[in-house]
Amino acid sequence: MTCQTTVKISELIIPKYQRIFNNRNIRHIILTSGRAGTKSSFAAILADYRLVSDAHGSVVCLRKHHNKLRKTVYKEMLRGINRLKIPKKEFDITKSPMEIRYRRTGATIYFSGSDGIDDTKGIIDEDKPIKLVILDELTEFFERSE
């Protein structure tokens, strides 16, 4: 016997982001708000939702520096899985390499820092094309000294 839980996305994300959640016609989204503005939470819920609802795609999450991945976007993705009430046993969750793979379809969330060009240029998934890229803390990618 399977027990399913219904989760309302509208109860998980703020109204400002609800209209863009399932809009596949929007190709680029830049989320703006202040601190604690739920940008990372929205991105995690969107990525986790896409992971389980699209059997043919994967997700890449990037931060400027590797050393901040585990405590930020990786942790937020795990929190998103909990908020969507998806049992963690449905995923292979690894820290090295840092990935979250949905067992049912093989769709994966890949995590990478962008400390150097070599860190991101090889992220390819032959079986599940990357359909969503999340740049967490976008402003870090455009520091004045670079």
Regions found by a protein language model. Give the residues of each.
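Short, flexible loop motifs at catalytic/binding sites
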Residues: 1-146
